[in-house]
Regions:
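Phosphate-handling architecture centered on phosphoinositide signaling
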Residues: 2-188
């Protein structure tokens, strides 16, 4: 039997190179077009339906959270930009659902956008969590905390980015993007 190794004196270190790949100091702009999918993928719902229910409602209904199809495109304030995720695409590249527990009770929701396999990644990520932070008046403390954690030895942080989200709800017949405001994207 080998001797047990002690972790006393071992130091946890974050990988600083992960934070140097992208500039997270500004605001990214995302355009999300939502549409009704199909029953086999569980995306046969409207945008209104997925925003209507809380985690408690789903528990009472004994069903998984509703999802819709989504086409996620990254750009600037003028629209999607060539070379960025989803540019020029017409078919959905993601599924979208409300995320969070108690936050699912808020009027403005947090979203989980899951990019479909083979449809690309955004900053190396297929799961994009967008948090609204409705209970936090300034709405920047969460990002600030993660940014500060980067500089503390033996603490692991997550990459974060402010995101300005625009949503076009094709499930209601809309043909234009509505401004959903500022979100914080947190690495999953």
């Amino acid at each position: 039997k080998s001797a047990e190794q002690s972790i006393d004196g071992a130091h946890l270190r974050d990988n600083e190179s992960l934070y140097k790949v992208y500039d997270d100091s500004g605001v990214e702009t995302m355009y999300l077009t939502v549409s009704r999918g199909n029953k086999s993928e569980g995306t046969d719902h409207s945008w209104s339906e997925i925003n209507q229910y809380s985690v408690d409602d789903y528990a009472a209904m004994r069903t998984n959270r509703y999802q819709v199809n989504g086409l996620l495109q990254v750009g600037d304030e003028q629209g999607p930009v060539s070379g960025e995720l989803g540019y020029g695409e017409k078919a959905p590249n993601a599924t979208v659902q409300v995320r969070g527990q108690s936050s699912s009770l808020n009027k403005q929701k947090n979203y989980k956008i899951e990019l479909k396999s083979g449809k690309g990644k955004w900053r190396g990520q297929r799961t994009i969590a967008l948090n609204k932070h409705m209970g936090e008046g300034l709405r920047f403390r969460n990002k600030m905390a993660y940014d500060l954690i980067r500089g503390i030895d033996q603490m692991m942080g997550l990459r974060t980015q402010f995101v300005h989200l625009y949503v076009k709800d094709e499930t209601s017949g809309s043909n234009s993007f509505d401004d959903y405001g500022l979100y914080t994207q947190v690495e999953q």
